[in-house]
Amino acid sequence: VCHGTPLPKLWDKYLEYQKNNYHSEIEDISFRNKTYGYHSGTMRIQFKNGKTYYGSARVDPMLKSFFKEISSRPSCYQCYFKNLERCSDFTIYDCWHADQLVVGLADDDKGYTNLIVQSKKGEQVLEKIKQDFDIYPVDTERAIALDGIMVRNAAHPHPKREEYYQDMDRDEVAEHIEKFIPITKKDHLIEWSKKIIYRVGIYRFLKKKMS
C-alpha cells in the first residue's frame, strides 16, 4: 500500500543537501530503517566517508514533508488503485496493531505485515512459501480499520502544497521545508534523547513502559 510519491526533484535536492552536510557521496539509503524499532522508522543514510546519518520523521526534512502530505505528486491525491479490488497478486501494508488482531500475540517492535491475497496466483505463491513465515489469519476489514486506511483512501493534499513546490528552487531544501513544516527545538531534543537512551541500552524498555 503506497502512502505517496514525492517529486524526484525534491528527492534529488534532499540528497544533495545531505551530501553537502557530510562532505561525501552516499553509499546506501534506508527510507524506513528500523534501528530504533518497527514503530520508529528512521531515515538512515550511509556515506562513503564512513559516517551515518539517522533522522526520524520528527526531524528529518524529507520524512517530515512526506508524512505531512505536502510533497506527493498530484496523481497521488487521486490514486486509482485505492480500493480493495486490485490487479496485483498481493496487497501488503504495515501491521502496527498485531497484538489487537491476534489473541496472545505480543508486539515485539520488530514488525508484522498485513497481507491480502488478491488472486489465484497469489494463493499458489503463498502456499509455496508459507512454511518460511509465521502466518496468522485475521479479519480483513478490522485489519484495514486499524492499519490500512490507505488501502482505500488517497493522501489528502496539504493546503500549502502548491506554494511549497512553486518556491522550492529559492532556498536550500531543509530551509524551504522548515518554512512550511517547522521542526521545533522540542523535536530536536526528543530526537537527541532517543539516540542517547538507545546507546545506553534502555530505549526499547522505555518504549514498552510508555506504550
PLM region descriptions:
Residues 9-14, 41-45:
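Short acidic, glycine/serine/threonine-rich loops at helix termini
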Residues 1-12, 29-32:
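Long, charge-dense
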